[in-house]
């Protein structure tokens, strides 16, 4: 298990990105959080198997919704954190 901090920019606020990311994370059995940042980015903290996290990032970049346009997605490994589930932070 590992935990990654994922920063996503583009047209990702006000278009259902957090909801879509949460749904995808739950389908992939990832745990963590997703929240909007003041600078227009979305921050995701996700814990799971390495291959599953890679799949999650690939699917975030392509195909969540026609209204979502991911311009950049960066990942950084951070100390492993256990979450009970995956949720949106408001």
Swiss-Prot record:
Classification lineage: Bacteria, Bacillati, Bacillota, Bacilli, Lactobacillales
List of catalytic residues: 18, 36
Name of the gene this protein is made from: acyP
EC category name: hydrolase
Reactions catalysed according to its record: an acyl phosphate + H2O = a carboxylate + phosphate + H(+)
Domain Acylphosphatase-like span(s) in chain numbering: 3-90
Organism: Levilactobacillus brevis (strain ATCC 367 / BCRC 12310 / CIP 105137 / JCM 1170 / LMG 11437 / NCIMB 947 / NCTC 947) (Lactobacillus brevis)
Protein name: Acylphosphatase
Listed InterPro entries: Acylphosphatase, Acylphosphatase-like_dom, Acylphosphatase-like_dom_sf, Acylphosphatase_CS
Pfam family, one: Acylphosphatase
